[in-house]
């Protein structure tokens, strides 16, 4: 988030723009996704993919990963300086799936990074179009958020695996810029900071010298990003303490973990954007849609409308349920991994179930999986209604701080209560309220204790019919207040491994 006073919308962050009016924002976001679409079409031509093969989400992901790898300056430099066996630093590639005699075949392709960069720039009016690259990173991050659990990563940094709802964007690369910072959850920022502090504890030179100065600047910048996500004065004051610490150590780690726990009830503001796979934008461009002229928004009706009439396919393993695979991708498309299932189900128009009950693994297929038994099916990515994506944590009473369940970070701006187990959360706060941050800790705990699970968030906000593009008639759903829905309860998903 930029400093107060120059708050830019996500779209501006996403397109690297300075302050623009709504029409200019819509046009520049449109230009960004249009560029992605043009690039995708060109890549399909290069690879001689049929329209059918081009609609396969696995092919889309391979192509997206190739362009991200082609523009990864730091990794490219590293690869050139540390040549490893069997890795050509100048090439990038991945699995492409083709339809042959009624079966899907895997083919590993290899391309010059330079060539990929040329195609990308050509599709983006000769520019590097970093915003489009970030957009693809956020789509991959949203897919990871819906697919994997981060229990191991949480435990490694001393956090509680039940804090998974704070982990949005935990797999985003460092280079994802302001748009990336906006979508990172409180837990993700805390984890990045704890890793940094731990390195400082173990490595005496981490904060020293010319490099240490740069490290320090990065540390303070990350602290400010996290501070900007908190909505209460006490949480922000604690972040100032962490940032200004002369020599960050265990006290800072304690404070950060305390703050992460507090965010389960006093929620942070985390942005949500619907970032779709490149093939979806490609389909639209190919059908003659002019994104720049029509304008586009990541937080309004546009992504819903795009998904209403695009057919995306996915490979399906023998014992996977295609409907479950569709739910996974739908959640990823709308950045709804941490949303209340009651809200997601209402918007989608079909029941969205917790991940522990899904019979599906990740979207990507490992190179050792047998293609003989692979089938494909059309993903059902349509919705019954649409709703505006939110950037607030849904805190009530003057939108300051309020209730939250262990495990929800609202995506849609739709009225609901945010049920939570206060006993479970408060149990984590026994004991330590001494030290420099004692008064802030006491204040935070007091606010958490006064939060009521029955309070309504997003008062008066509703969903809209897909024909209601100007959002004139909100339909405010009524939810069963007792039956909260978290995607992560009873979870048995795979861990995310880089």
Curated annotation (Swiss-Prot):
One of its GO terms (cellular component) is ribonucleoprotein complex. Residues 1-21 are annotated as: Disordered. A motif (Unconventional nuclear localization signal) lies at residues 1-18. A motif (Bipartite nuclear localization signal) lies at residues 198-216. GO terms for biological process: symbiont entry into host cell; viral penetration into host nucleus. Homomultimerizes to form the nucleocapsid. May bind host exportin-1/XPO1. Binds to viral genomic RNA. Protein-RNA contacts are mediated by a combination of electrostatic interactions between positively charged residues and the phosphate backbone and planar interactions between aromatic side chains and bases. Encapsidates the negative strand viral RNA, protecting it from nucleases. The encapsidated genomic RNA is termed the ribonucleoprotein (RNP) and serves as template for transcription and replication. The RNP needs to be localized in the host nucleus to start an infectious cycle, but is too large to diffuse through the nuclear pore complex. NP comprises at least 2 nuclear localization signals that are responsible for the active RNP import into the nucleus through cellular importin alpha/beta pathway. This is Nucleoprotein. It comes from Influenza A virus (strain A/Swine/Hong Kong/126/1982 H3N2). The lineage of its organism: Viruses, Riboviria, Orthornavirae, Negarnaviricota, Polyploviricotina. The gene is NP.
């Amino acid at each position: 988030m930029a400093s107060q006073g120059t708050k830019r919308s996500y779209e501006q962050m996403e397109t690297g723009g300075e302050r623009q009016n709504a029409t200019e924002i819509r046009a520049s976001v449109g230009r960004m996704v249009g560029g992605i679409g043009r690039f995708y079409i060109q890549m399909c031509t290069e690879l001689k993919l049929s329209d059918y093969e081009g609609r396969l989400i696995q092919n889309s992901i391979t192509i997206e990963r190739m362009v991200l790898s082609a523009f990864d300056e730091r990794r490219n430099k590293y690869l050139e300086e540390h040549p490893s066996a069997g890795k050509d630093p100048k090439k990038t590639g991945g699995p492409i799936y083709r339809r042959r005699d009624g079966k899907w075949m895997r083919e590993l392709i290899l391309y010059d990074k330079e060539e990929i960069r040329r195609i990308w720039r050509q599709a983006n009016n000769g520019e590097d179009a970093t915003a489009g690259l970030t957009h693809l990173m956020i789509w991959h991050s949203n897919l990871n958020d819906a697919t994997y659990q981060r229990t191991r990563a949480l435990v490694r940094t001393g956090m509680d695996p039940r804090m998974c709802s704070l982990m949005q964007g935990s797999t985003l690369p460092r280079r994802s810029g302001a748009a990336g910072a906006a979508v990172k959850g409180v837990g993700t920022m805390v984890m990045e900071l704890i890793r940094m502090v731990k390195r400082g504890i173990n490595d005496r030179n981490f904060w020293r010298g010319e490099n240490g100065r740069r490290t320090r600047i990065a540390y303070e910048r990350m602290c400010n990003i996290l501070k900007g996500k908190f909505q209460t004065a006490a949480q922000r004051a604690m972040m100032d303490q962490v940032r200004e610490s002369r020599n960050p150590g265990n006290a800072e780690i304690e404070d950060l973990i305390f703050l992460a726990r507090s965010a389960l009830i006093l929620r942070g503001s985390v942005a949500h954007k619907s970032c779709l796979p490149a093939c979806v934008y490609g389909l639209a461009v190919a059908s003659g849609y002019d994104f720049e002229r029509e304008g586009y928004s990541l937080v309004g009706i546009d992504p819903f409308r795009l998904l209403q009439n695009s057919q995306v396919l996915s490979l399906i393993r023998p014992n996977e349920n295609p409907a479950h695979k569709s739910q996974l991708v739908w959640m990823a498309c709308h950045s709804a991994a941490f949303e209340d299932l009651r809200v997601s189900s209402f918007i989608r128009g079909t029941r969205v179930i917790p991940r522990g009950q899904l019979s599906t693994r990740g979207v990507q297929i490992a190179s050792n999986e047998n293609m003989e038994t692979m089938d494909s099916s059309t993903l059902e990515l349509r919705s019954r209604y649409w709703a505006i994506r939110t950037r607030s944590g849904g805190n009530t009473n003057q939108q300051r701080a309020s209730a939250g369940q262990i495990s929800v970070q609202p995506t849609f701006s739709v009225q609901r209560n945010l049920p939570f187990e206060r006993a479970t959360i408060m149990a984590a706060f026994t004991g330590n309220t001494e030290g420099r941050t004692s008064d802030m800790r006491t204040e935070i705990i007091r606010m958490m204790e006064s939060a009521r699970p029955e309070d309504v968030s997003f008062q008066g906000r509703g969903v809209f019919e897909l024909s209601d593009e100007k959002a004139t008639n909100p339909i405010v759903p009524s939810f069963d207040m007792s039956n909260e829905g978290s995607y992560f309860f009873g979870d048995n998903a795979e861990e995310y491994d880089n």
